[in-house]
Amino acid sequence: MSDSLNRPPRLILASSSPYRRELLQRLRVPFDVAVPAIDETPLAGETPEVTALRLAQAKARAVAGGLGAGVAALVIGSDQVATYDGLQIGKPGTHANALAQLQAMRGREVQFHSALCLFDSRSGTVQAVDVVTRVQFRDLPDAALEAYLLAETPYDVAGSAKSEGLGIALLEAIHSDDPTALVGLPLIALSRMLLAVGYPLLGAQ
């Protein structure tokens, strides 16, 4: 049997996020990164869960669609939507928007929907899950919020706080089944999906 038949499918992360890339490196598997070109605008009437799942699948399918015919690949798509009081919270983009987000969330519980999709190009099958993390924010004064934003500039993350960095100081508690979900890529769920399709994550199974 040839090496090509024994070789596992390519693993591709469909994301431009350096945080997701760093998380995937923890699994110690070779992977490529491809940036999906999709419209990430939420649709009218969508729940946060539906938005996150739709975008995670769209990212994976967009990258898979650009692969050559016959390429065996497992494409990982992920998306995160934060919400409180029924309002969706996106990436702030600017300092002013980030400050407004943190002011609105202080003293509140915020839910982060971290959706994950694994698209198998060999069969066209999709595994998808939404991992919910409940985060209680501390009730901090504006001066503390400003100091945090100037220190970490978290303008590219939903909710304006990097829990893997200084942003942890803004939080009172985190409740989740997957400690990596809040950063943006639920590794417990991803490991389960990879093992389910026979990927040799822990060696030959």
UniProtKB/Swiss-Prot annotation:
Write out the GO cellular component annotations. cytoplasm
One Pfam family linked to the record: Maf
Active-site residues? D79 (proton acceptor)
Q: Which GO terms describe its molecular function?
A: nucleoside triphosphate diphosphatase activity
Q: What are the UniProt keywords, alphabetically?
A: Cytoplasm, Hydrolase, Nucleotide metabolism
From what superkingdom does this record's organism come?
A: Bacteria
Query: NCBIfam families annotated for this entry?
Result: maf
Stated family? Belongs to the Maf family. YceF subfamily.
Q: What is this protein called?
A: 7-methyl-GTP pyrophosphatase
Q: Which organism is it from?
A: Paraburkholderia xenovorans (strain LB400)
